[in-house]
Amino acid sequence: NSIFSGLMPLQIEKMFPELWVDEDSEEGKNLNEAPLIQTQIERFRKKYTFSYHKVHDSQYNDKLLIIVPSLLHNQLNVVVLNFVDMLSHARTENKMIRELAQSEAAYRSLTRSWFQHSGTLELFKRIAGKGYKVIVTTDHGTIRVDNPEKVIGDKNTNTNLRYKVGKNLNYNPKDVFDIRFPDKAGL
């Protein structure tokens, strides 16, 4: 959400509590991306018109291709491509994807192949062909972990594989990057 709001998580929680989703909440954490973009535009006192689209499948991408002319009336169009995120999760959860993406090179190749044959490449070409800038960014990368570190916590510790939040966490401090005071890091 920081990439959309231009703020650190702690700032989002303080400035826009209605858009903040706590770590232990059952609610999806990415449901407020469009309103967070709006808050950033307003904070910088811009009068931009914008659109927000989250592409979960090729059918939605095809719809975007059809409405490109209407998108060009906006000063900003945000398109979230969920495929790479879904692929990174599937790499740990799906045996077939694990077979296809056994190495980092294979994973990148699979991602590249998807991009070259997806409607996303055509979408970018159409937008760029009209003289508009296409900026591609990411909210996080992916690292394949071969030797995970064990972090043990109580029953209230979150289950996220990328990071742990909780009290009384036990781990080897030589092998884990920890932030003891998350608020000082803006988290």
Language model features by range: what are they?
Residues 1-187:
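Feature captures the catalytic ectodomains and active-site-proximal regions of enzymes
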